[in-house]
């Protein structure tokens, strides 16, 4: 038997051991991989086994070969998870893109709607302007025809308005002048108002317009809308002229017979009475118009006219009921005529230097207010016609309304 060298036996032994070790490593790696796939929660293990390495010269030297099983397992798990996650990711992405596109598309749509509405409104205004421009000659022609048809009523209305403005201005000026007012001017305004009223009724005597002053119907036959408007307008102005004439008569009364303070309350009461009268005097005219308009023959039209007339009466009653508080307050002030203070003593007058702060003259009938400031009775009465506080310290003296105490008359036309 021929003996082999020692190094050959050693090399063959090492090669056998290397093969066995390699098989063992491959078997353990496959077992560990199957174990990782079966359980996702198992911790990763890093397994290092010594593997002999051969040198390039043919001599074998033993070295360590490290195989990282955890990295391979983690890569395999990550790949499997990525396969599971991808469908859900792709499933959500269209919805996100859909929401984004919907929000992006809603903005331009709203802007387009606004621009369309704005352009439509501008075009409508432009078409209206073009229509008015084309229709202006026709409107002018028919307006001229209406003016010619109602030239009498328009002329009378302008004349009555001018008369009212002139008389009202004269009365207010004379009330402001007090003792220095011109009696001749007051008499002239009174005569002017009477002459204007009689001239108007005499000119249209065939229509018997003066009947409406006493809540009767004038003789106009079938009453149309413009006829009712004509009667109510004239009656309203003539009623104002009547009460303005009464104010002129009060102005003619000497101050030693009626004080200026009392005259102020009379002006206020007359104006309140004039407004109530003008509110009521138009009721019979419009009631007749609502019933008799168009010579109603059928029963349905007659019943409809009665219904409208009843509604008109209800509205008129509501208006009168709304003015009830104002009228009652005015009547209470007229009857009581409250004082603004007490008669001032000589000491109070001397403390005020014996001179009224309003008229800058010596006191005449001095009155001491609740704030102890002293003024002339007539001066402080004129002051309280428009104010409610003391002229010096602005202390509230009176809560009452003193409107119309300056002799003015309301221009408001109570047509209905």
UniProtKB/Swiss-Prot annotation:
Keyword tRNA-binding attached: no
Residue ranges, compositional bias (Basic residues): 81-100
Membrane association type: Multi-pass membrane protein
SMART domains named in the record: RING
Source organism superkingdom: Eukaryota
Enzyme Commission designation: 2.3.2.27
Transmembrane segments: 146-166, 184-204, 214-234, 237-257, 265-287, 302-322
GO CC term, one of those recorded: endoplasmic reticulum
Catalytic activity, reaction form: S-ubiquitinyl-[E2 ubiquitin-conjugating enzyme]-L-cysteine + [acceptor protein]-L-lysine = [E2 ubiquitin-conjugating enzyme]-L-cysteine + N(6)-ubiquitinyl-[acceptor protein]-L-lysine
Pfam family, one: zf-RING_2
Stretches the record annotates as Disordered: 1-50, 68-117
Coiled coil: none
Chief place where the protein resides: endoplasmic reticulum
Region (Required for ubiquitin ligase activity and for protection against ER stress-induced cell death) location: 349-400
Gene Ontology BP terms: positive regulation of ERAD pathway; protein ubiquitination
Role played: E3 ubiquitin-protein ligase that acts in the endoplasmic reticulum (ER)-associated degradation (ERAD) pathway, which targets misfolded proteins that accumulate in the endoplasmic reticulum (ER) for ubiquitination and subsequent proteasome-mediated degradation. Protects cells from ER stress-induced apoptosis.
Name of protein: E3 ubiquitin-protein ligase RNFT1
Source organism: Xenopus laevis (African clawed frog)
């Amino acid at each position: 038997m021929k003996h082999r060298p020692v190094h050959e036996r050693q090399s063959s032994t090492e090669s056998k051991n290397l093969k066995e070790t390699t098989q063992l490593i491959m078997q353990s790696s496959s077992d560990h991989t199957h174990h990782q796939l079966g359980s996702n929660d198992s911790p990763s293990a890093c397994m290092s086994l010594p593997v002999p390495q051969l040198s390039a010269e043919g001599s074998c030297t033993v070295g360590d070969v490290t195989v990282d099983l955890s990295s391979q397992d983690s890569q395999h798990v990550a790949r499997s998870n990525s396969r599971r996650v991808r469908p859900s990711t792709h499933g959500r992405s269209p919805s996100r893109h859909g929401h984004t596109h919907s929000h992006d598309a809603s903005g331009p749509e709203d802007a387009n709607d606004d621009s369309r509405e704005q352009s439509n409104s501008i075009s409508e205004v432009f078409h209206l302007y073009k229509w008015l421009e084309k229709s202006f000659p026709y409107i002018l022609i028919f307006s001229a025809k209406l003016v010619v048809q109602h030239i009498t009523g328009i002329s009378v209305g302008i004349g009555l308005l001018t008369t009212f403005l002139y008389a009202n201005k004269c009365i207010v000026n004379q009330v402001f002048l007090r003792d220095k007012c011109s009696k001749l001017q007051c008499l002239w305004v009174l005569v002017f108002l009477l002459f204007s009223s009689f001239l108007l009724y005499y000119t249209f005597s065939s229509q018997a317009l003066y009947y409406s002053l006493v809540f009767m119907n004038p003789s106009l036959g079938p009453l149309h809308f413009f006829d009712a408007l004509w009667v109510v307008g004239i009656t309203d102005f003539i009623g104002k002229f009547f009460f303005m004439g009464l104010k002129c008569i009060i102005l003619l009364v000497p101050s030693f017979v009626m004080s200026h303070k009392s005259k102020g309350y009379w002006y206020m009461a007359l104006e309140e009475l004039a407004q109530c009268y003008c509110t009521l005097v138009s009721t019979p005219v419009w009631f007749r118009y609502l019933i008799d308009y168009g010579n109603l023959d059928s029963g349905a039209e007659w019943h409809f006219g009665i219904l409208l007339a009843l509604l008109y009466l209800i509205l008129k009653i509501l208006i009168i009921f709304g003015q009830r508080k104002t009228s009652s307050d005015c009547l209470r002030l007229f009857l009581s005529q409250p004082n603004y203070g007490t008669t001032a003593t000589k000491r109070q007058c001397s403390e005020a230097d014996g001179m009224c702060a309003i008229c800058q003259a010596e006191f005449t009938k001095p009155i001491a207010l609740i704030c102890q400031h002293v003024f002339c009775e007539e001066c402080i009465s004129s002051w309280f016609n428009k104010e409610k506080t003391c002229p010096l310290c602005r202390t509230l003296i009176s809560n009452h309304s003193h409107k119309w105490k300056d002799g003015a008359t309301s221009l408001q036309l109570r047509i209905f």
